[in-house]
From Swiss-Prot:
Source species of the chain: Nitratidesulfovibrio vulgaris (strain ATCC 29579 / DSM 644 / CCUG 34227 / NCIMB 8303 / VKM B-1760 / Hildenborough) (Desulfovibrio vulgaris)
One GO process term, biological-process aspect: anaerobic respiration
Classification lineage: Bacteria, Pseudomonadati, Thermodesulfobacteriota, Desulfovibrionia, Desulfovibrionales
EC number in record: 1.97.-.-
Name recorded for this polypeptide: Menaquinone reductase, multiheme cytochrome c subunit
Subcellular location: Cell inner membrane
Alphabetical list of NCBIfam families matching this protein: mnquin_red_QrcA (NF041781)
Keywords assigned by UniProt, alphabetized: Cell inner membrane, Cell membrane, Electron transport, Heme, Iron, Membrane, Metal-binding, Oxidoreductase, Sulfate respiration, Transmembrane, Transmembrane helix, Transport
Residue numbers binding heme 6: 205, 208-209
PROSITE patterns, A to Z: MULTIHEME_CYTC (PS51008)
Amino acid sequence: MEDRQLTNADNENGRKCACGGAAPFFVGLVVALVFGWWAFPEMLYSQKEQPIRFSHKVHVNDAGMECKQCHSLREDGSFAGLPSTASCAECHSDVLGSDPEEARFVAEYVKSGKEVKWLVYQYQPDNVFFSHAAHSLDGCNQCHQFSERELCNLCHLDVADSDKAPTHYENKLTGYSKQTMKMWQCERCHANENHLGVTNSSNACFVCHK
């Protein structure tokens, strides 16, 4: 009887020792991961380039195009996102210049009717709805004097002067882009009581989260 009690006690102590040894390991692992994330944040992201080298500078500065000529509104107020190959073909049915990337685009996409699989920098989660119509020049310029480019650049990367699209950083865990809008960015305007008074808008969660 005593031997059995001793055996049970030994087993209990063994289990306690095993747990006691594992706890510091897991705590150390968590600390190491958090420190690594803080010290080397880029390790969380994979870097990808766009399938076609697209020059906003040529289209915006040289050709005088505006954002809305390629990024138009849907009926629900959201942007249609990226232009289709058909819309690009309105100007690029044939090669216009000497850029080899344009020649490749015409050959691989325009002639075949294939869509370019552009990497979206600010693709939002499915539970987030953002109305571009509600954030238009007509609304913001009741008080401000933004140009279209200035208004877009409040949320989007300023690429008008770039000959190449920025590198796309994709989160290895979530699949979302590093540039996906964060709530603190929205709060720059939505936490301002003066904005709410002028626009009669609401900060209720369901306005943006569906």
